[in-house]
Amino acid sequence: MARSPVEPPASQPAKRAAWLRAELERANYAYYVLDQPDLPDAEYDRLFVELQRIEAEHPDLVTPDSPTQRVGGEAASGFTPVVHDKPMLSLNNGFADEDVIAFDKRVADGLDKATDLAGTVTEPVEYACELKFDGLAISLRYENGRFVQASTRGDGTTGEDVTENIRTIRAIPLTLKGKRLPRMLDVRGEVLMFKRDFARLNERQRAAGQREFANPRNAAAGSLRQLDSKITASRPLSFFAYGIGVLDGADMPDTHSGLLDWYETLGLPVNRERAVVRGAAGLLAFFHSVGERRESLPYDIDGVVYKVNRRDEQDRLGFVSRAPRFALAHKFPAQEALTKLIAIDVQVGRTGAITPVARLEPVFVGGATVTNATLHNEDEVRRKDIRIGDTVIVRRAGDVIPEVVSAVLDRRPADAQEFVMPTECPECGSRIERLPDEAIARCTGGLFCPAQRKQALWHFAQRRALDIDGLGEKIIDQLVEQNLVRTPADLFNLGFSTLVALDRFAEKSARNLIDSLEKAKHTTLARFIYALGIRHVGESTAKDLAKHFGSLDPIMDAPIDALLEVNDVGPIVAESIHQFFAEEHNRTVIEQLRARGKVTWPEGPPAPRAPQGVLAGKTVVLTGTLPTLTREAAKEMLEAAGAKVAGSVSKKTDYVVAGADAGSKLAKAEELGIPVLDEAGMHTLLEGHAR
């Protein structure tokens, strides 16, 4: 269904209304039928409100099929239509506190509640408050306690029969609990997918090389509307009941909160995040309380729902057009919005990670004006096919960094430009590289790069590195921001007068830091290597490097093959070490530390090579708990026989020795077809009798 023609101005109400109807119907089709929404909720709401206003001002422009006259959507051709016994209507929306106050006043007026001389309601209305789930509305039909049919909302009057798919959702009971069950019960509720289940589903999709879902709502809708119910059964769907259609053969509870309590006794899942409150103040208190906890909830919501609690008062208020007068959906500020992508820059993180950042035309989303949004990495830009000049959907949820969700492809201009990852760091000019099997590109500037400076200095001073006591993050911030320190070597040039001039840095603190810097000049080779902050090189690897080579220069000049001979150094770590020392900036800083800083450590000859044994040239991995040997004892025995004991399984692994509770290493070995031995098999191997 193609996007509507050129947008007419507001000065032409007839054409504008026709365009709005066409645009909303197109969005409805994409949302309900194709399950491929391309218009953010906030944009849809804005267009809908505008159409309502035009039709209110020009009643002659109202058409029977206008989106304002119905709920929206139509049955897909692959499902049998189901006419609802009672329409599944949508709710009127509120976006601001004032909308809620006005709703409460309308309800109070409609119920003839008492007011004082100032017009303030003195007899507050009682409301039931619930969450507004971001899923798919469903009607469940039970006859004499047995589940017989399920249907989607559709256009509110006619939906789609999804009975077989709904049967696969374990949260939905096929038989209700209790003895006096109604002859017929029409339960209204929402099918949704929890955040954790959504993440796992997308992991499975990626592993299978299949398309990932954009969000939990799309995943739930796409899963429910499968023609093959086996596919639905494989999807982690959930359900919450929140309303009622038709009830026959039982008394209707007097209140909405009572209805939900009754549902729980029947075994239907009902969300516990609900409350009964009085008046507008109670409604707003519930809204703001939920808003504060929204991001920590295990599922997506886009607002809360208020309903007059008493059933008799609901009946008195009745319905207007497409929605009940007794209810309101109070929506949170839009988390998604449309805007234009002006440019794509790259940002250098504190660890050298290169992140593409979208520069946007300002847009208000998630309660704030957004001008920049993350694009995560180069692969994400390619996967989403995002280009400079595109109209894009931007998402901002709570304190989460804004991100570009997708491009609106049918709005793409002819001159849209693809993103090209730069080859040099914009901060220091060093080479940008991306290691195999990694999604993140990184600056190789290391100790020299300004963007990485604070993190490099903080790591350099850590207790397990050079142990510079008194050099905390706040002091580092001042030193860098005042351009007093550019590299770790500059730390050893700091004088007393420079330090006491820093904010909140007393004379005693300055003397202590100078003493600490003096002590740090005398360290060990392993600590110095660790202090350099080489990616993938932790304390253990630093010790192995120092032990294997004995001094720093051979490490700096070692080819990758020589690095691979070091215990527990695999291809990725070896490549990282090699690239670090290949960068001239890093070598310069190291020379400054040795010369200007006078940082020293004992050096010696390389460690003697292990004697040639029955396992010379073999790589062995230990995993799990062995019956009689500790991990360290087994390692010593294997190394004494000439084996290299590695920490991870790869194609270069010759044997895996597995004990109890072996985990992913064992699975990886079986996947690669690597021989797996138990402790007895290891002893046989060491005796030279292995095959």
Swiss-Prot record:
Keyword DNA repair: yes
Spans through the membrane: none
Protein name: DNA ligase
Entries under Pfam families matching the protein: BRCT (PF00533), DNA_ligase_aden (PF01653), DNA_ligase_OB (PF03120), DNA_ligase_ZBD (PF03119), HHH_2 (PF12826), HHH_5 (PF14520), Nlig-Ia (PF22745)
EC id: 6.5.1.2
UniProt feature coiled coil, ranges: none
Family in the record: Belongs to the NAD-dependent DNA ligase family. LigA subfamily.
Residues given in the record as NAD(+) binding sites: 41-45, 90-91, 130, 153, 190, 307, 331
Top enzyme category: ligase
Keyword Signal: no
Single GO BP term: DNA replication
UniProt xrefs under SUPFAM superfamilies: BRCT domain (SSF52113), DNA ligase/mRNA capping enzyme, catalytic domain (SSF56091), Nucleic acid-binding proteins (SSF50249), RuvA domain 2-like (SSF47781)
Gene Ontology annotations for the cellular component aspect, listed alphabetically: cytosol
Gene name, Swiss-Prot/TrEMBL: ligA
Active site: 132
Classification lineage: Bacteria, Pseudomonadati, Pseudomonadota, Betaproteobacteria, Burkholderiales
UniProt keyword terms in alphabetical order: DNA damage, DNA repair, DNA replication, Ligase, Magnesium, Manganese, Metal-binding, NAD, Zinc
Residues covered by the BRCT domain: 610-691
PANTHER family from the UniProt entry: CHROMOSOME TRANSMISSION FIDELITY FACTOR 18, DNA LIGASE
Organism in which the protein naturally occurs: Burkholderia pseudomallei (strain 668)
Stored InterPro entries: BRCT_dom, BRCT_dom_sf, DisA/LigA_HHH, DNA_ligase, DNA_ligase_AS, DNA_ligase_CS, DNAligase_adenylation, DNAligase_N
Gene3D superfamilies named in the record: 5' to 3' exonuclease, C-terminal subdomain (1.10.150.20), 6.20.10.30, BRCT domain (3.40.50.10190), DNA ligase/mRNA capping enzyme (3.30.470.30), Helix hairpin bin (1.10.287.610), Nucleic acid-binding proteins (2.40.50.140)
Gene Ontology MF, one: DNA binding
